[in-house]
Amino acid sequence: MATEKGHSRDDEERVPLTRGSTEFRNSIDSFDYSSSTASLSLAVIDRINNSTQDAGLSEKGPRDDDDDRYWDDDVEYDVEDADYIPSGGKPMHKSVKIALWSLLFLSLGGWSLAFVLFIFRSHDTYQTPILSEDNISSGGLRGDRITLDDVLGEEWMPRHHFISWFPGPNGEDGLLLEKDGPGSTGYLRVEDIVSRKDTNSSKGSIVLMQKNTFTVGGETVICSQVWPSPDLKTVLVLSEKKQNWRHSFTGKYWLFDVDTQTGQPLDPAAQDQRIQLASWSHKSDAVVFTRDNNMFLRKLSSKEVITITSDGGVDLLYGVPDWVYEEEVFSGNSATWWAHDGNYIAFLRTNESAVPEYPIQYFVSRPSGEDPNLGEENYPEVREIKYPKAGAPNPIVDLQFYDIRKGEIFSVDVADRFPDDNRLIIEVLWASNGKVLVRETNRESDILIIAAIDVLSRTGKIVRKEDINALDGGWVEPTQSTRFIPADPSNDRPEDGYIDTVIHEGRDQLAYFTPLDNPKPLILTKGHSEVVNSPSGVDLKRGLVYFVVAGNEPWERHVYSVKFDGTALQPVTNVSESSYYDVSFSDGAGYALLNFRGPKVPWQKVISTPANENPFEEIIEQNNHLSRKLRLFSLESKVFQYINIDGFSLPVLERRPPNFDPTKKYPVLFYLYGGPGSQTVDKKFGVDFQSYVASTLGYIVVTVDGRGTGYIGRKSLSLVRGKLGHYEARDQIEVAKKWAAKPYVDESRMAIWGWSYGGFMTLKTIEEDGGRTFQYGMAVAPVTDWRYYDSIYAERYMHTPQHNPQGYDSSAISNTTALANSVRFLVMHGTADDNVHIQNTLTLLDKLDLANVDNYDVHVFPDSNHNINYHNAHKMVYTRLADWLVNAFNGQWLKTNNPTPNDSLFRRVATWAGLYKFKHLC
């Protein structure tokens, strides 16, 4: 799911979005919410004090004039009340009467002045957060507080160098591709990792491009991306890149000759036409590319372009994925695979003719870049995308092959494979001698087959089949991490094979299959730890596999190696420390870029692997700027722990405000994502929105990786299938109850928030909870009914709606009565969200309207996609989250049942002052 692949694949976004320790102030909890029974004078004074405290706050929205909790509405105050004489009583003495009248007028004058000051100094109900002096911890200040701008900008982002390891043309290991670094020579270079430390030596360094610009026929080409050929003689250049969806883009492509430092169009006959994808042959003699959904071949020996397909168009795609395959299967823009010998190309043919379209409207922008027709300037631009929702027709995909020598396309029939309407192709892996492995699943992603195809004989067969639903009730995640292991009799490998991730004893483990058609593997890893996106590297000479595991604790990541026979399991990183690493390996796995991601300040270094006879180490990033900032700022402290719910040990992260005082009462915000296989509780360093909430606003932030999330076992993972939201919401609520019972938690101020799947989980949790534990919720870009989400993702975890209608009904956000029992909730969505359509939010609003539910706020972001970043929207969404949360915990959203007009003198004075203020501001 969207920004969520990052989570499910252990990436940064989160999010999106992805994706420290200790502070100086606590939460804003100085307001007294019991003032409804206080006297008018105390109420006014209290309100003025709070107004003074709020002075300088920016106005965010209209004031709610029905917010009367500072007033005693049971008492009517009128000027005549002071002159009331009981019947039959003695006339009042004149001097006493004068004194009383004087006191009355002084009181009225004071009250009127107080109201005027209140109106002119206070601000709207929608407030910007500030810190109360009452909440400064007794421990004193430990440093500056971070701002929202700090966490939304790049000040706290670790610097991260991306090294592109490059296989040497002559088998060299440890070569890397670098672009325009400090003190470098040339825009694009290939360098030997060992010799580059010697700045006086040019050994092992090849300059491929001196500059990032060149001229072709009078046109200046500016490089957007570059891909050197395997022989390092030519560079494939992309210019004028234009983003399409999350991973796909178009642009102009060029061939740049390294010797002459000159360029030419990839297709000289169509220089200005935009291309969707281009990739090198392993022999460096040709480039295959897709344009207008058709495939073409350019051999470097000729300027002519060979047409491979010609019937591609709106409904038929060749070599590139459609929207749903790009998003949910490949997480990329390519569906083209070169054979190692350069004689064949495998590619997907995608038929979308039966897939329904969904319209994306753009009200402000025109992403097409085209001017509207005359008279249509005031109409929104509409882009129709082929988007298969759950239960709708899927694109039909076929694997086809192109024989370059014969110039023909062919397919290979495989007996007993899935039929067209029940087939997903999720990985294609070339082996040797014309063999290719194809990983397929059924539509619901719970039966896996591996087919072996021989393109030389044009035959194929199924070599492995696994029923995951029967095994543990789970599903198959699409991955592209399988590694081919070629035969090498001199190294005790008589047959070809491959290394894959399999389910073993309830965990994801590595397995070695050899020969290719052997369905019974050798299990390489065992035990409590689970492998993550592995294998990461393979050393064919030494017979070693390198991989990353979620270590002794699920929030850790460590790097290990093991031999092909399953022996000599060794850690590469220091497993005695609770840390989070990731790694990338050189082509021969003799060197590695080791990334320490946390919990301390991240660093990067290039190392030789333990099996390398020539030890090497070079630190390339220490993030000293973050070390300096940590000495100046106060950040939250983090507490990692487990909470047992229904027999499952769930990872929990509690962020505590700096100078945490266990004798105080803190509001609590739960932050979650919670999607299947995802992880949010980890030991990566990060200063994000949650850090701001804990460190600057002074609230406790709790994150729970509940059932269905990753790296806590398949039993927990598979349990959620067919009923998304049920167990996950229960876990959030049960953990929240435990936190509400803690002596340092204010149980009357608890909120929950999330984005995308986390938005769905926010609404599901407050729906299930019905206001008993969580009073507030904030949902960004939420799914509200899985029938509205794309078929491949939704059906993987929910089956089809036809197969599981009750599950879809139960998972949908539909209990409006329960939502009405919360104090208030917030929903935000981008109108141009191509991933989680705004249809989700709009249909929920319709349900709320029909049920007369109004305890919510909505913010819609015009033309923003799932990331919500168009026209300042990224900053606005987090500002709104922060301000709304502060108002919630300040009690600004407390409901008033059956509000009635208040026509008292003081309300009239307040109204008059407000009108006066409005008149003069205008």
Swiss-Prot record:
GO terms for cellular component: plasma membrane; vacuolar membrane. Residues 121-922 are vacuolar. GO terms for biological process: proteolysis. Glycans are attached at N135, N200, N351, N574, N815, N902. InterPro entries: AB_hydrolase_fold, Peptidase_S9_cat, Peptidase_S9B_N, Serine_Prot_S9B/DPPIV. It is a single-pass type II membrane protein. It is found in: Vacuole membrane. Disulfide bonds: none annotated. It catalyses: Release of an N-terminal dipeptide, Xaa-Yaa-|-Zaa-, from a polypeptide, preferentially when Yaa is Pro, provided Zaa is neither Pro nor hydroxyproline. One of its GO terms (molecular function) is dipeptidyl-peptidase activity. This is Probable dipeptidyl-aminopeptidase B. It comes from Ajellomyces capsulatus (strain NAm1 / WU24).
